[in-house]
């Protein structure tokens, strides 16, 4: 990856852009689940929300997740000494794995809502919506402060 050495900061900038896009989608998608669950009895409304869920997941969240992973891996390949910079990186990567699990669980929620919109109530999705915020806060603290 020597040919990319001079581009580390560019890759990092695109990584930040991708993360922002991914997080925006993960913040909004469960809010759509809330609307979906609250209005399960309104077929037309549910139809519109389902389209929004699918488009947000397929055209924003998933590509942003992929680009986040690609640029993150590229940064580690360009600068492998990051692995030796402290335990903060390993903790961050563990939290990223949780974000990935959350991302794919959102897809499962979409399928469940499509089959049975009354399976979980809106309150569940409101609480569920907090997870990416908490993970993001922890990741940002680890990356900026590098506490260990």
Curated annotation (Swiss-Prot):
Give the enzyme's EC designation: 1.3.99.-
Q: Which residues bind heme?
A: 15, 92
Q: Which note does the record give on the cofactor? A: Binds 1 heme b (iron(II)-protoporphyrin IX) group per subunit.
Keywords in alphabetical order: Cell membrane, Heme, Iron, Membrane, Metal-binding, Oxidoreductase, Transmembrane, Transmembrane helix
| Gene Ontology biological process terms, A to Z | protoporphyrinogen IX biosynthetic process
Compartment list: Cell membrane
- InterPro entries reported in the protein's UniProt record: HemJ-like
GO CC terms in record: plasma membrane
Q: Does the keyword Cell inner membrane apply?
A: no
Which Pfam families does this one have?
UPF0093
Cofactor field: heme b
- Say yes or no: keyword Metal-binding present: yes
Primary location recorded for the protein, binned into one broad class: membrane
Name the domain of life. Bacteria
Can you tell me where the transmembrane regions are?
A: 7-27, 58-78, 86-106, 128-148
Its assembly, as annotated, is: Homodimer.
Q: What protein name does the entry list?
A: Protoporphyrinogen IX oxidase
